[in-house]
Amino acid sequence: MSKALNFLAGVVILAILLAQAQTTEATQAGASKPAANTNGFVVDLQKHWTTAQGLAVAVAEAMPAADYSFKPVPEEMSFGEQIMHIAEANYGYCAFLTDAKSPFVDLAKDAKIEKAEAVKQLTGSFEYCSAAFSKVTEAELDAVHGTGDHKFVARDVMLGVMIHMVHHRGQAEVYLRLKGIKPPDYKW
């Protein structure tokens, strides 16, 4: 299974590199450039976060409740653990962003993860982050959060939560495929 996951990751990276090469080639060939973005980083991130929420929740809902304990190999998290991990990390990153304590409560720790609870936690974590993002102004993007060795600017925290979530959602999509379930289609 690990080889299949590594192969899939390699295919995704290759596709990204090919797309970047085509974009560079088109730009060098004199293709028209898109209009300058005047929305600002926070507005743009919020738009993509909303899309990501829909995709992540759709992935969580696609797996039958009976398969939430499915693990492709023993050393991996179960599907339910992946979903709860996304929720916990979302809460953690966004609490860090607002200098607050994470409201995440791991009700499933050392217990069977129920689908309904996992989807509820996941949805709540996206809403929590959306509210946290809306409190950050463009002027505050370079504000430092954290203490000691754990200091990050707001922009890094916001990008970090997105990257972390996408990484684990991608893993969850592979779990769906391994169970013979087509993951939800990507929506822009």
Positions of PLM-derived features:
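Positively charged n-region of N-terminal signal peptides that target proteins for export
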Residues: 1-5
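Short, low-complexity N-terminal intrinsically disordered segments enriched in polar/charged residues
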Residues: 31-46
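Bacterial N-terminal signal peptides
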Residues: 6-20
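Acidic/histidine-rich alpha-helical segments that form the ligand environment
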Residues: 59, 111-146, 153-166
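Sec-dependent signal peptide cleavage junction
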Residues: 20-33
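Short, contiguous alpha-helical
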Residues: 46-50, 54-57, 67-107, 146-188
